[in-house]
Amino acid sequence: MSGFFGVTSKKDCVFDLFYGTDYHSHLGTRRGGMAVYGKSGFERAIHNIENAPFRTKFERDFDEMEGNYGIGCISDSEPQPLLVRSHLGNYAITTVGRINNLDELVQQAFRDGASHFLEMSGGNINATELVAALINRGSTIAEGMRLAQEAIDGSMSILVLTQDGIYAARDRMGRTPVIVGKKEGAYCVTFESFAYLNLGYTFEKSLGPGEIDRITPEGAEVLLPARDEMKICTFLWVYYGNPASTYEGLNVEEMRYHCGDALARRDNIEADGVAGLPDSGTAHAVGYANRSGIPLVRPFIKYTATWPRSFMPTNQKRRDLIAHMKLIPIRSLIENKRLLLIDDSLVRGTQMYGTTNFLFGSGAKEVHIRLACPPILYGCPYLNFSRSASEMELIARRKIAKLSGEHADITPYTDPDSPEYAAMLEEIRSELGFTSLRYHRLDDMIASTGLSSCKLCTYCWNGKK
């Protein structure tokens, strides 16, 4: 994943830009960047943040940069923001999304006269550079952003910094949020709504799907109105959104309480304590405990000072190491106890296997696993939130292949009342060593959001676009 933040202010914007961008650090662990526009023109800094946090890497830039307009990003892929000089003028650009037809668009750009694209390490082309090339096909920034989004198969939200303000475009299907905040003399635009709260901003608006606005210190001007159809990523609430954020009027923490509540209403397990796997599983566990009456406990504590999210690193051994080292057991709360552990999801199963062994090794009598979303059956074609190289890395798909063959019809396994679904769960439970296993039902999860199912993307669970 990635996240971005932008500021337009009548005063220097660097303070707000620095901290607003930093508040997106949970969305990526590879690179951070900031670009500002002021009296000296455009300034930009990009740093690798794999081994040090954003604030540490950008301290010097924070002291040296100045300007009234700025954009920043936390990126889990390409370096950005990029500085661009084109017939549209000079600008800086940052993006959040995924381009599935990148090679096709690059070849089309060559046919249209583009001479080259800079290659990143690993042989990949910077997707943000390609987006800039697509924007440059337009006669204006706004028209170019529209053309870029129409050409892209996948999803793409964009911030473009110019001397006239920040142009903000939300993905055409609204898969990721773009939110505008305001305070006296300044407006900001952000992925995470909580990122501006401690900076003194209040909520102004959410851009609708495909909407393009120009943000200035005076306000947000709509250049292209929103489309009606929306498919916002449901996994925002389940896992990778910050608990303090609100999307489409629904707070992440509250939605997780609702998920836990719904899980408990369909469960009848006896346990000595309910625990959430930190951090995203914690709120789900609160909802479960409140509904079930089973005490909420913390049998392990997350050491937050230095360990990042284990979901992010590309290397499996690195992910497993982080998942293990960041959790410190409290043996007196584990030994001889029947524990019910809730996590947001189960992707490959390696980390939950390690956590279960960790609890049994610390003396747990039983370990019951509850997941706050349905089995993940498909890789996401819209956002880079999963590091699985293929769908056969997904533990649910591996078990389906074992039961019915690699090319089996998946449909029966999406029905939580079917015998095929029950067989898949038993295969997963047995391999990972859980005492019992239950997933959140898709219908219950959708109900937990309070939003219409037609507005939510559920592709990774049921394959429906």
Regions found by a protein language model. Name each.
Residues 1-208, 214-271, 277, 366:
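Conserved short alpha-helical segments that host acidic/polar catalytic motifs at enzyme active sites
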Residues 14, 101, 175-176, 196-197, ...:
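Flexible loop/turn segments at secondary-structure boundaries
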Residues 94, 161, 169-170, 181, ...:
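Generic beta-strand/beta-sheet core signal
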Residues 108, 112, 134, 151, ...:
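Generic, well-ordered alpha-helical scaffold segments in large soluble proteins
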Residues 121-129, 296-309, 403-408, 434-447:
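A conserved beta-strand->alpha-helix junction
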Residues 164-165, 200-206, 356-465:
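PRPP-dependent phosphoribosyltransferase catalytic core
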Residues 195, 202, 210-211, 261-267, ...:
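Phosphate/diphosphate-binding loops
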Residues 293-338, 349, 377-389:
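Short, glycine/charge-rich flexible loops or terminal/linker lids adjacent to PRPP-binding catalytic cores
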